[in-house]
Amino acid sequence: YLIAGVTVTENGEVTQYSRDQIKIYTQGRFMYAFNNAVIESIDVGAGDASWSNGVMVEVPRVNHHGPVSGYSFDVAIDQTETGFEQTVIGMEYEGGRLLDMVEVWDKASTATSAFDGLWQLQTRESNEPNISEFAETKMIGGGHYIWLQNAVFEGEPVKEFGFGTFEVDANGDAIETAMTSSIPDYEGTVSAVKMELLDKNHFTQSFVYNGETVTQTYMRM
């Protein structure tokens, strides 16, 4: 799903926002990502999703700061002709800010693949001496993908995200076309990725970055 608009209420003040945001639900998991003007930072979350008494219960397991636990959000969802409307009451942000949000979402695709799901990076083979402590969460579903990366680059912590469209054939040859990212130069790029399912809970992907082949192994979350 791609967001069509969002209304935020804070301390009685109502603000309308338009932003590039994606949300993927698949196989009992969720992930969303966008550049958040409210907190002036990236805003990414992923975790478990399940229906309970007519509401979607989202339990985050990771966000842009890293692994998280102890949170649960009841998300009221109303189906629409083009997607759904989502209401979250009492969303807490850094500094104790409490926001109420109403989001309107449009369905982007119903495509499926064998790689659909929420994945956590296990190993990374790369000749990048300036990068360490590299962690990644990746979601694939509905013909789209999202990735969240946390790492240390040249001694400084960095956190980035990207999302776009995803196509893969029966041989595992995938094309990822970037739509939005916290890295401006990444937007609009088209990446060829070789993917292989090792079993139902693990896959590898390889791609060329700065002339070097990067190979990564993921485990299903």
Regions found by a protein language model. Name each.
Residues Y1-A46, S52-F163, D169-M221:
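Lipid interaction determinants
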